[in-house]
Amino acid sequence: KFKGAKGRRLFPIECHDIMCKIGEVVVVGGVRRSALISLSNLGDDQMRHAKSGQWWENEGQRALANNSVAFKGKPEMGTFMREWTSLYESKSGERGIFNRQAAKVKASENGRREIDHEFGCNPCSEIILRPYQFCNLTEVVCRATDDLASLTEKVRMATILGTLQSTLTSFKYLRKIWKDNTEEERLLGVSLTGILDNNIWTEEVLSILREVAVETNKKMAKDLGIPQSTAITCVKPSGTVSQLVDSASGIHARHNDYYIRTVRGDNKDPLTQFMKESGIPHEPCVMKPDSTTVFSFPMKSPSGAVTRTQMSAIEQLEYWLMFQRHWCEHKPSVTVSVKEDEWMDVGAWVYKNFDEVSGISFLPFSDHTYAQAPYQDIDETKYYALSSEMPESIDWSKLADYEKEDTTSGGRELACTADACEVVDLTSN
């Protein structure tokens, strides 16, 4: 593939593919130890179309990374419309939007952060990072029964945990700059998930909870003898955590009243073989048919849950903006589901609010190009039909019969933005 590059500098798309491939194969302790985002120049046409068409057939490694365009500020209307049209035509939600100037403005708001840096973000785009810097994430699970008092206590505990984690700065195999940045900023990432399972949210409530996090960290940092964190609050996409705790993911609505949830497993993993022989519906992964199996589970949302069919794209964006302004010192990660007749209005909203759009990704409401998508809509009849095909029970004690040797393999979690953070891999833990 790279023979044609002999004697010249690599193109960004070639560097991107190399990094994606490295991310795919580097495994430590049986877990894939990489997460990737590519922030590319506005004029980079190859990166703009990296996930256009049937990209997974020949460039499957690109599923390992999120792709966003790094705007330096609000572009001219014509420039914005060309990029917006490309995003629409890709049907994959990429490239997403990352506004470096908006990120810098957001980082400056609390007055605690040095902003003379070329800020980027983490792969899921909820943490504003300098170069050579880490995330430090903790999560609050919001339940329908939570009130301000219980959420206050959850935020306090998550902040204490994150502050303790910020003291772990012994990075023996990294350059000193990583340690210096980590110790100087002591970043936290106190996140909320299950947001739309509760209707408590107002600007006042969010501001109160943010202040709880800031004051808790300030006191805890003083007790530990470390600097106060320069940025604390965010909203993670929480695709995996939400599955574990049965909540809506991050700031997103639940997918639908009835849907299919897909889960990936490595064919060498004893758990994959056990689930196959237990009768759970499965098929080969279209991107890795020889090594990966996709399992399908019919799901039903809890009664009264907010689903994505109940929120317009503009409502999702306005909700995002409220959390951006009143909860986050970093930013809320979001993938906005856009119906076919909403793209023009959504583009107008994004352009109007561009100075605050630090980072957002978009995905067509239904006909996106990801095969074996993490969520697939079904109706009630289909749900009960598929449920009848599921095994009545599984004797998990028999899993030991399959675990004859160490067959640990790297979990291949796909990238987080544009719906792919919802991909769950059974071998990732």
Features from the language model and the residues they span:
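Active-site cavity-forming subdomains of large catalytic enzyme subunits
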Residues: 1-142
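Short beta-alpha connecting loops at secondary-structure transitions
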Residues: 3-8, 67, 177-181, 202, ...
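Inter-helical turn/loop segments and adjacent helix faces that build the functional surface
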Residues: 2-13, 144-152, 172-178, 198-206
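Short acidic, low-complexity intrinsically disordered linear motifs used
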Residues: 408-429
